[in-house]
């Protein structure tokens, strides 16, 4: 029984250590991708659904970057301030069209409505990189 307990503890520690290494590798890839301004694209779309920082946008241009994604996509707005959007609004947004894991929402790091900037690129990018450093390291 004692050997079994030691084996279970060993396997649990090994599993947890493996998860930590996996997160560190993911964080490194995310930081590399999100740090390079060349990976960002600015798109235009229509707000379909909005809840706090989560937004679903209809964007036909997204298919040019993600062939497997349909024109409706989930995004997360990386703003420290509440951004008010209305369903049906036409918005211009900057994102990195790349999914790192299943369920990952594409980041919005810049947001404009009629040339009115609601989230600047610099602020949004900084918030996104901070989020990666906090959640994946």
Label each PLM-derived region with a short phrase.
Residues 63-78:
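A short macromolecule-binding patch
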Residues 21-40:
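Short boundary/loop segments of OB/S1/cold-shock single-stranded nucleic-acid-binding domains
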Residues 79-94:
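Short nucleic-acid-contacting surface segments enriched for D/E, G, S/T with interspersed K/R
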Residues 1-5:
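Positively charged n-region of N-terminal signal peptides that target proteins for export
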Residues 97-134:
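OB-fold/S1-family single-stranded nucleic acid-binding modules
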Residues 34-57, 61:
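Structural detector for short beta-strands of small beta-barrel domains
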Residues 60-62, 96-98:
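Solvent-exposed coil/turn segments that connect beta secondary-structure elements
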Residues 15-18:
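C-terminal motif of bacterial Sec signal peptides marking the signal peptidase cleavage site
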């Amino acid at each position: 029984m004692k050997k079994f307990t030691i084996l279970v503890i060993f396997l649990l520690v090994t599993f947890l250590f493996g998860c930590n290494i996996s997160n560190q590798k993911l964080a490194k890839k995310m930081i590399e991708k999100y740090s390079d301004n060349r990976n960002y694209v600015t798109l235009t779309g229509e707000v379909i659904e909005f809840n706090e920082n989560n937004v679903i946008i209809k964007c036909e241009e997204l298919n040019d970057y993600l062939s497997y994604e349909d024109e409706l996509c989930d995004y997360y707005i990386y703003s420290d301030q509440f951004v008010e959007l209305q369903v049906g609004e036409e918005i211009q947004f900057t994102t990195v069209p790349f999914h790192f894991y299943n369920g990952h929402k594409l980041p919005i790091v810049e947001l404009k409505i009629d040339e009115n900037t609601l989230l600047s690129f610099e602020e949004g990018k900084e918030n996104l990189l901070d989020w990666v450093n906090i959640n994946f390291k």
